[in-house]
């Protein structure tokens, strides 16, 4: 990283301050990255479990496939999905709190006996599918945040901190060289003045 530097004490102090900020911030960002990595892993596992549960529910649904031709699908519909927001390692993610279903009244005497079980099965199926979608959305947000945090860690570790250290080293060398030149020029001037005094005397 090419850092624009001025070879003076003010620039030196500013660069030291910026370096300290990055060195102090790096462990915090690393902790956030590891927390996000763990959360992504947990979220992937949760998504896989929900996928498996959804497959089992679909298989149970397909087992009664012949009966579903009689079922009135307009009896049940999703009325509302209640959302929440949760912060995970500083990242706001959606949280499924509840799913409200609207069940139209039907005649218990005229409808087949298994309708109640069918409605229950459809509720479970819909709830699991909605929960899976929320988990996948959460996973996407967490993975994006983890990638950004990893990029920031790499930027600090591999580019900015070494860049600032290099710039500080250059400024310090320049200032030391300038000081040495100043001292040596003073010595030369002093020795020339002494030679003149000796020549005059």
Residue ranges and their predicted role:
Residues 1-201:
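Charge-rich amphipathic alpha-helical interaction elements
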């Amino acid at each position: 990283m090419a850092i624009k530097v001025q070879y003076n004490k003010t620039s030196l102090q500013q660069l030291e301050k910026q370096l300290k900020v990055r060195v102090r911030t790096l462990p915090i960002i690393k902790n956030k990255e590891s927390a996000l990595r763990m959360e992504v892993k947990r979220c992937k596992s949760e998504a896989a479990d929900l996928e498996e549960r959804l497959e089992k529910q679909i298989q149970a649904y397909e087992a009664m496939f012949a009966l579903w031709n009689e079922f009135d699908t307009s009896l049940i519909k999703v009325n509302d999905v209640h959302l929440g927001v949760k912060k995970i390692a500083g990242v706001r993610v959606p949280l499924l709190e509840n799913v409200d279903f609207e069940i139209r009244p039907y005649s218990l005497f005229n409808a087949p006996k298994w309708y109640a079980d069918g409605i229950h099965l459809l509720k479970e199926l819909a709830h699991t599918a909605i929960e899976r979608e929320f988990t996948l959305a959460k996973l996407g947000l967490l993975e994006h945040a983890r990638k950004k945090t990893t990029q920031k860690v790499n930027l600090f570790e591999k580019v900015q901190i070494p860049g600032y250290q290099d710039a500080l080293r250059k400024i310090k060398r320049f200032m030391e060289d300038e000081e040495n030149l100043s001292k040596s020029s003073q010595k030369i001037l002093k020795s020339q003045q002494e030679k003149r005094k000796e020549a005059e005397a």
